[in-house]
């Protein structure tokens, strides 16, 4: 009769054998790694093949571990480079697909994703302030031409237009907000045209209709103009209906919206009420990091009100416009409102990540992207009325008004002549845009024209 062993004894013996085998394998593998590390450390200590470094590395365990840590650094660096390269390749691939869709006439639609939600929890305002501090650091004189030329190659900037030699820009911040040589941006002299206030790409343009005044951010999503300019905006929106009801509604709207400013500027209300009915138009222009960053006046006009909205600082690139709702309404911005010879005009300078600082030349004391005292502030936008005794501040066509610390977006909203003609007919006095979506424009270039009747 064969002896029988208990089942648990068999499994215990099997488990003990596996443990001894695994321990032996780990010890062999550890010895192999230690040899590699010691050889690598010896090669670094003695490039010509000295044996002392290798012998020391193969010695005590503590010394081997301390020198072995250096072996992990190149691997981590290489992994980081590969990861960044993969992300960049993916971005280039997606951009290429977007360009192919545009060439085929396919318009991109709004599509929110999880990345946009993740951006909402990041401290983008603090990051932008830290970035601004870094960009303000002084660069050694000998290094400045190399740094600025590298930036120009990366973002396609024209250094020949810079007003000063590259050595005179003490920091990247000074270089970004540089002025241009005289005559680099000729201003269209036609009195019946509105010129571009910035260098950039035309994203959207058109006529505002209805009482809500919606601007299409991207196909499938729009944002409200009153939300962009503020609830106290002087915007003369017209409700849909017959011409007579339109005139009455506009009169009521003007009485309410202009009441606050008219108390301080009686001449302002007289000019607005005396001006004829006009169409309301908009134009959205995006500035890339390599573009000229100063904002100029699009026409001769009087700025009467300035509002500063301390909002978020989401990025405003093409990907962000397709994934973040109400992007321009959510972001920090400075709005200038006033009148010109054709009626209402507003210029909204919208900030973005690392571009929270917007400076006004007409109000140097204004500071944007300041630390918030509350986590979720509910206070209204900061507002200032210019020149309460008169018609506001006079801004001449083509003159510098403000500056972005990098690139961002400008939204221009204005009234222009519209002929009161039956539907389906045209008139030479109508305002017409002379740019197309996606066009590159420069300061002083005409955005649209009309003819005097």
Swiss-Prot record:
Ranges of the Mitochondrial intermembrane topological domain: 94-453
Transmembrane residue ranges: 75-93
Statement: the UniProt record of this protein carries the keyword NADP: no
Cysteine disulfide partners in this protein: none
Keyword Membrane: yes
Oligomer and partners: Heterodimer of a large membrane-associated beta subunit and a small pyruvoyl-containing alpha subunit.
Name of protein: Phosphatidylserine decarboxylase proenzyme 1, mitochondrial
Lineage: Eukaryota, Viridiplantae, Streptophyta, Embryophyta, Tracheophyta
């Amino acid at each position: 009769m064969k002896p029988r062993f208990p089942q648990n004894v068999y499994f215990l013996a099997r488990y003990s054998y596996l443990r001894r085998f695994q321990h032996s394998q780990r010890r062999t593998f550890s010895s192999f790694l230690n040899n590699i590390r010691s050889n690598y450390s010896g090669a670094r200590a003695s490039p010509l093949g000295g044996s002392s470094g290798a012998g020391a590395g193969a010695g005590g365990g503590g010394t081997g571990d301390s020198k072995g840590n250096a072996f992990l650094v190149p691997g981590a660096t290489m992994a980081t480079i590969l990861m960044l390269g993969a992300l960049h390749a993916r971005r280039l691939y997606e951009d290429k697909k977007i360009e192919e869709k545009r060439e085929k006439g396919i318009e991109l639609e709004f599509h929110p994703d999880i990345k946009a939600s993740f951006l909402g929890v990041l401290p983008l305002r603090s990051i932008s302030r830290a970035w601004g501090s870094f960009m303000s650091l002084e660069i050694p004189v000998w290094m400045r031409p190399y740094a600025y030329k590298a930036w120009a190659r990366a973002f396609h900037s024209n250094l020949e237009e810079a007003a000063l030699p590259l050595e005179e820009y003490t920091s990247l911040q000074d270089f970004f907000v540089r002025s241009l040589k005289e005559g680099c941006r000729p201003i269209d002299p036609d009195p019946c045209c509105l010129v571009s206030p910035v260098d950039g790409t035309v994203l959207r343009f058109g006529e505002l209709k209805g009482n809500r005044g919606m601007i299409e951010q991207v196909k499938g999503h729009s944002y409200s103009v009153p939300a962009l300019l503020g609830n106290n905006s002087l915007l003369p929106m017209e409700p849909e209906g017959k011409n007579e009801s339109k005139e009455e509604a506009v009169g009521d709207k003007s009485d309410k919206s202009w009441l606050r400013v008219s108390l301080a500027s009686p001449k302002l209300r007289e000019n607005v009420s005396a001006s004829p009915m006009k169409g309301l138009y908009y134009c959205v222009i995006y500035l890339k990091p390599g573009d000229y960053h100063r904002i100029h006046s699009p026409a001769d006009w009087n700025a009467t009100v300035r509002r500063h909205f301390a909002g978020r600082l989401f990025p405003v690139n093409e990907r962000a416009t397709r994934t973040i709702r109400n992007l321009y309404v959510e972001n920090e911005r400075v709005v200038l409102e006033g009148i010109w010879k054709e009626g209402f005009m507003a210029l909204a300078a919208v900030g973005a990540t690392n571009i929270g600082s917007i400076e006004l030349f007409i109000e140097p004391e204004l500071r944007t992207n300041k630390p918030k005292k509350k986590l979720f502030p509910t206070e209204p936008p900061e507002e200032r009325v210019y020149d309460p005794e008169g018609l506001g501040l006079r801004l001449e066509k083509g003159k510098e008004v403000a500056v972005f610390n990098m690139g961002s977006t400008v939204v221009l909203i204005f009234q222009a002549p519209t002929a009161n003609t039956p539907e389906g007919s045209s008139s030479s006095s109508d305002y017409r845009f002379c740019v197309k979506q996606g066009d590159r424009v420069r300061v002083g270039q005409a955005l649209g024209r009309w003819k005097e009747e």
